[in-house]
């Protein structure tokens, strides 16, 4: 709180694709620098899907997916830890420090911020038997003390989605699940999803079908009618889950755009989709 005013809290999620190229990481870091210069408290959650797959190949590991989710055995968990907390976390940290962003890179397991539990076998569409995803976590508990302390000291947390269970077993947590858990546990004003596509399109091949604004109540109808398909369905389902957990709005922006995050927070012109929680 500054001068009696509530500090704006912003949660930014970036996928591994966003972090592959140095120029893209530097663009993201410049954007974050502008946002924190405006007084916001920022937390970044990052994935590392492409990096895990590539590192797995180098280590002779085959990536296995069921219903779009990675199956994580013990060797693949080691690759995930190296890719997330090592490669992507370190690369993002370096870009942020270059942009004068006081970032701290750490797994979500640190200080018990997020405690996981091994996901039980799940019934998923298209699979004859329940799927055992291996060393993959569901969220059991969020203890926000670490984030609150980092924010109070002026730092920007960069969180990878590695957690431990109550017995200290390292687990791979989906980055989407980490975002929704943090939104539920903390007072988050805005969530920004930085992706390869700047928002929601009815047809990715047709720029005129871009949807600049939506209410969360519109999402189910768009999916049921087939108006959005493919990866857009999963993205909108993620947005709906985030808004249900308490965020006021979610903006989807493209990582190729300069200062896309700052522009979304300031309602400046730009190519993006903003989804708001419907009034009660």
Question: What kind of region is each of these model predictions?
Answer:
Residues 2-280:
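C-terminal catalytic "cap/lid" subdomain
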